[in-house]
């Protein structure tokens, strides 16, 4: 197979932080006093990456593929990310790389980086994954510990079969 085209996607997500919910990033449960409010598990990192991947493939957004229905209530967003990779693969795309930033000040996230990266590399089927953490420097809803947000950019490659019969 030979590369035909490369496409860039961008994704973003944010959720309020509330009592009684878990804080999950890329399937990793974070020890935090508040959790992310959302229809699924509220995993803003996985959601931002899903939107970036779907954007790169011109396939809509997370709500197009995983609507707020009973089927996806409290869904594991890492599983949704794996499903998104399958959706892309079925259309001839593969993930080249992902770079993401999570903004939150409720808890220090760097101790979770290696497990988050391990989960993402497995789900995305690429070793070219990077995640950064920012505090918000006391500004905005992330800096005031009222919410969490994530940004992601990705590069996907569309493969064309060049084998001759």
From Swiss-Prot:
Keywords: Isoprene biosynthesis, Lyase, Metal-binding. It comes from Thermotoga neapolitana (strain ATCC 49049 / DSM 4359 / NBRC 107923 / NS-E). InterPro entries: MECDP_synthase, MECDP_synthase_CS, MECDP_synthase_sf. The record marks 39, 135 as: Transition state stabilizer. Its EC number is 4.6.1.12. Pathway: Isoprenoid biosynthesis; isopentenyl diphosphate biosynthesis via DXP pathway; isopentenyl diphosphate from 1-deoxy-D-xylulose 5-phosphate: step 4/6. This is 2-C-methyl-D-erythritol 2,4-cyclodiphosphate synthase. Pfam families: YgbB (PF02542). It is an enzyme of class 4 (lyase). 4-CDP-2-C-methyl-D-erythritol 2-phosphate binds at residues 13-15, 39-40, 61-63, 141. It comes from the Bacteria. The keyword Metal-binding applies. Transmembrane segments: none annotated.
């Amino acid at each position: 197979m030979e590369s035909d085209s490369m496409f860039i996607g961008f994704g973003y997500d944010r959720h309020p932080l509330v009592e009684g919910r878990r804080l999950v990033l890329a399937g990793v449960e974070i020890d935090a006093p508040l959790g992310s409010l959302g229809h699924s598990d509220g995993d803003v990192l996985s959601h931002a990456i899903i939107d970036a991947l779907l954007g790169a493939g011109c396939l809509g957004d997370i709500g197009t593929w995983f609507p707020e229905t009973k089927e996806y209530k409290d869904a594991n967003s890492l599983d949704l990310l794996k499903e998104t990779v399958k959706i892309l693969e079925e259309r001839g795309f593969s993930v080249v790389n992902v770079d993401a930033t999570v903004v939150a000040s409720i808890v220090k996230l760097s101790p979770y980086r290696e497990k988050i990266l391990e989960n993402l590399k497995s789900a995305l089927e690429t070793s070219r994954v990077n995640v950064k953490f920012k505090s918000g420097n006391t500004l905005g809803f992330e800096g005031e510990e009222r919410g969490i947000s994530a940004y992601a950019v990705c590069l996907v490659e569309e493969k064309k079969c060049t084998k001759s019969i």
